[in-house]
From Swiss-Prot:
Residues 71-87 are annotated as: Switch-II. SUPFAM superfamilies: P-loop containing nucleoside triphosphate hydrolases. It comes from the Eukaryota. PROSITE patterns: RAN. Residues 202-212 have a biased composition (Low complexity). The keyword Transport applies. GTP-binding protein involved in nucleocytoplasmic transport. Required for the import of protein into the nucleus and also for RNA export. Involved in chromatin condensation and control of cell cycle. Keywords: GTP-binding, Nucleotide-binding, Nucleus, Protein transport, Transport. This is GTP-binding nuclear protein Ran-2.
Amino acid sequence: MALPNQQTVDYPSFKLVIVGDGGTGKTTFVKRHLTGEFEKKYEPTIGVEVHPLDFFTNCGKIRFYCWDTAGQEKFGGLRDGYYIHGQCAIIMFDVTARLTYKNVPTWHRDLCRVCENIPIVLCGNKVDVKNRQVKAKQVTFHRKKNLQYYEISAKSNYNFEKPFLYLARKLAGDQNLHFVESPALAPPEVHLDIAAQQQNEADLAAAAAQPLPDDDDDAFE
């Protein structure tokens, strides 16, 4: 399906909407993919930048047309035109800012009101920053809504490909799909050392084993 400002390509392509509070790192994340950044198009009627991100899988090439809001979410909600025809989504929050996580349910509701039954990934960004406010055990929304959750660090490229691989597998209906080469990414601006990565993964595993609280707000008392 060709959407405004999207050239048609002869391989599978999908509209990916990225939502979340302003300042959570959505634009930084999308811009890591260098060819997508080079080929982005501005869609003035809706006020978004559309980045075509190509990935190479064992089943051939796949493209995500990533819709980036260009910061307009800071002035209230996004128009329905941003969501219409969305085929998959990423909801992003900032692990150093609690309010951005508390607003995740609102973004999820707005998304699901327009796009029913699409695969959604929740991403906690900025795990490279030391003063983390939202701990792994406090992130429970994805478990209640059956979403996939990844912790990422856009500036260090940590886990950059994981949300895209999850969505590609869901959209292709093939859990064995995998990327056969990495896209060209911008050089890391910060480095997340191996010990920090291992600690993150251990914290996530421990959090997944905990029973769910009755209410998300309990975790922040």
